[in-house]
Amino acid sequence: MKKLLAILLCCAMLCTSLAFGSYAAELKEDDGYTVGDVDKDGTVNAIDSYNIKATLAGAAGAVCDVESGDLDADGQISAMDSYYMKACLSGAMSTSDFESDHNVYRLLIGGYDINEFCIVVPEDATREDNAHYAAERMQYYIGLATGAELEICYGDENRTKEHAIVYNMVALDCELGEELGYEGYKYDVTDGDLNIYGTARGNMYCTYDLLERVGFVFYSDYYTFIWETRRVEICEGESESFVPELSFRMVAGSYFGGGGCEDHFYPQKLNGSQLYRAEDDTRTGTLTGPRFINAHSFGYYWRMATGTYTDDDHLYECWQSGEQKEESDWGSSPPWQPCATSDDDYEKLMLGLDRTITMIEKRGQKFTPYISAMSFSIADNQKGYCSCRNCTKKYRTEGYSGLYIDLTNRAARDIKKLYPEYPTLKLMSIIYDHSIPKTVRPEENVIIFFCGQGCNNHPINSGLCDGNKPLIHKLHNSAVVESLKAWTEYCHEAGAEIWFWYYPTSFLFYMSPCPNVLKLYDDFDFIINECGVDGFYFECGGRNYGFESLKAHLASEFIYDPDMTREEYTQILKDYLYIYYGAGYEYIYEYLEMHHVSGTMDTCYLNNFNYPQEMYDEEYLCANYEKMRELVVSAIALAKDASELEALEKLLVCCDFTGLSAVHTDWYKNGNNVDGYVANYDEMCELIQKYEMRPSTFQNEDGTPEQLDFTDYENSPWDQVA
């Protein structure tokens, strides 16, 4: 049994705080085995010794956990393990002789123990280089996992150990640099050295991939998990080269507010530029995507152009058509769009873009070649499109998407003239309208951000929603698929990129989360692997009461490695449930399956527009609420720490909030189970108070309610909103 000393962890956390800021994620450790207890009955005895011998003899029925029985940590059950086991039982030795204060008992690279290694960075490396940053991360996490203290040495001739983890900074303009690109890496194990090669981000990504092999799971903003294992080996002769398929990978939500950069965002290999505080951090290769404004920029640029411009980004008054607009009209989401065919409107937008770039430069920020972009995109509405004669005429053949993409094309041509010092700066334009334009095609330096707002109920390529009523875009998923394939083809023919904006979360009722976890793999696989998009934006978050952080984790894993199989994906899902919810994770997986089935497959719905009564099968919940609740309660009984208990109790609130809404008429109003209803209801309200949970978007602006009224549409997920 491992005996990790608290003081060592405190020291490790302090070191990280000094190196990377004031925050470090808490280490959550697996307690997966006890040395010698091969039958896992809680004691080490003669039966365990017998099981080891029986396993070696190939006897049927032998029970022998390899981690528990591999005393010498050679990766197998052997005669030496049997010998050591006998010695422990006789008192000549002790199982503590084969234990460690750390989660990884033995780490080998090229056949050599990790304690025989140092870390080598280029002689001229500084802390601003990605190779140096990666070396620091490797040093820190290997210390946590094994206790080894790896010295960072500058230049190979200055190495302090015979073997080394050697980081190499590769120039982007050399042959290997062109092969690896901005994010790829290559590594090999040769003559007992681990050699790592990368350009701007590759050294960092390789480090995190190797640390995952060691046993780390970077699953949370606030916690890092490590599995307990006897032996990890990176073998002599091993080599690998990897380049991420997607150029833009972003999972947006409330998961990066603590130490999210160092402990979650970068280890998850996300690179989206919406993490503003890290956009210019050269240690991590800066970030990819639009600077300053995520997507909807026309309202802001109009304000910058027509208001009183100063050296900072204070709010400016905005005038449109001679009228001063209200604040709600000139923010990032005004209820209007500029004219797409007016030279005057175009010049205002370009002036606003120019002034915004100037503002960014005056802050001391820089644009990174090939990966930096600026948004040049419609405001966040779908009703304010210009209806002048010229726009209406162009709309007939190009749709609203082609109408405004052509406006962005014009800006993309002019931006090269306006900023010749930024020859690779791209402009990003979001499209809501999925019309397939007849003639308009994007310029090479335009990024199309395709908002996939079809049906959130059915897998996007299932064909299951074709006959149902259309949603806000008058489109079902099959129409979205047709448009996405066409736009992807157009973009790639033009040498432009297309990114997909995916909406998996409903923000309307936080306690009745969208029951779509088990269909995400199908959507990811189709959108990325079959349609061939170049970037993926997964908008999640809100309140993490149900499975929202699980969705974020699954998305992060898949968009970095879209070649994973469904079996690999499912294993990642189950591992996460174990890490997040604890020993009762199998109960939660069964609950998750029932939660998926409880989502009705008979209708189409759209997150943030439809309400839970259209997303759930009320009849199924009425029949299965008690069983679903029992599963969560069973998992709660096995919780071993406060984080697991909080996660499970919040999940119970979601189960009760949705379930009690469904059975309200039968149990309470009709009197068939009033006592059970009141008991569950009271417990739910207590937990809502305990964790200060907010039931819905519409309610609890100023505090947590003491009671919920399921007959009030603002609190109930079942009553239809007029």
Regions found by a protein language model. Name each.
Residues 428-457, 511-517, 545-552:
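Substrate-binding cleft/loops of secretory-pathway carbohydrate-active enzymes
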